[in-house]
Amino acid sequence: MYKGIVQLVIGLMMIVTLLVGYLPIPEYLVELTCVSNMLGGVLLTIDGILSICRKKNLSSNLYRAVCVCILTVFFICLGSLTGFFHFNFKGAFFFLHVINPIAFVGCYLLFCNDAERRIVSAANFITPVLMLVYLLFDYIRCQFTGKFVYGFAEPDVLTFP
């Protein structure tokens, strides 16, 4: 019961901070910050409800896939502290870039039972798929718009011959 309540509260916090941060600027809804926080919030909310009502849990494979995305956001934000690029840490974006990733990974570490999972398993190959799909989406979007979502690289450099 405690686990489900914590998951539900953190999941709803992630969704609410996402809505507060991104509703005024809907053109940025394609950012990985938005996508990973929304997926993480929905995953925690659904898992919390299932845990409270039916005493069931979602697969830890889903948690790992979202962890890859949300930790990518977190580590890029840590890299922004070097001063090479700028990220918005004001208001809800502080939660989206710092607090929510830490809370989501904390939920994964505390509530997902991966102790009996083998290190080499076919299910582990699913983990990076979500991140790879997002990168493919960003590349295809760049082909249509002429710019990447975050603009870390010039489109001319990353084209196929």
Model-derived segments and spans:
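Membrane-helix exit/interface motif
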Residues: I46-R54, V73-F87, G106-N113
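Membrane-interface helix-boundary motifs at transmembrane edges
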Residues: I52-L62, C112-A122
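N-terminal membrane topogenic signal
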Residues: M1-I10
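Hydrophobic cores of alpha-helical transmembrane segments in multi-pass inner/ER membrane proteins
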Residues: I10, S36-I49, I99-F111
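Membrane-interface transmembrane-helix boundary segments in multi-pass integral membrane proteins
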Residues: F144-P161
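Small-polar-interrupted transmembrane alpha-helices in polytopic inner-membrane proteins
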Residues: G11-L18, Y63-G79
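Juxtamembrane "helix-exit" motif on the non-cytosolic side of transmembrane helices
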Residues: L18-P26, C53, C77-F87, I140-F144
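Non-cytosolic membrane-interface motifs at loop->transmembrane helix junctions
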Residues: E27-C34, S59, F85-H97, R118-A123, ...
